[in-house]
């Protein structure tokens, strides 16, 4: 695994989401979500409408797309509400001190 720093713990409020664009060969746009002490990194593009998930609402372990209301489980990337039917990639995430780290070379839901 190859973790990279994506933000500081203080950058994301509890129950909040932060859009992060990562440059480089594995560069992607991700949504970093904080649910209490749990952290998640999910691809920042709805599999239904191709709009940023980071602009949607977070409730528990789900993020809702602002456009059509598709919901995705932050732990699995699977859609939990229509109209989306395809999952979105999720990435290993950990906290080291005040740094939030994500491994973009591995997806947890292949």
Identify the residue ranges that each predicted region occupies:
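N-terminal pre-ligand scaffold of iron-sulfur
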Residues: 1-60, 74, 90-110
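Short cysteine clusters
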Residues: 46, 65-68
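Short cysteine/histidine-rich metal-coordination sites, predominantly Zn2+-binding motifs
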Residues: 60-66, 79-88
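Short helix-to-coil "ATP-lid" hinge immediately C-terminal to the conserved N-box Asn in the Bergerat
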Residues: 71
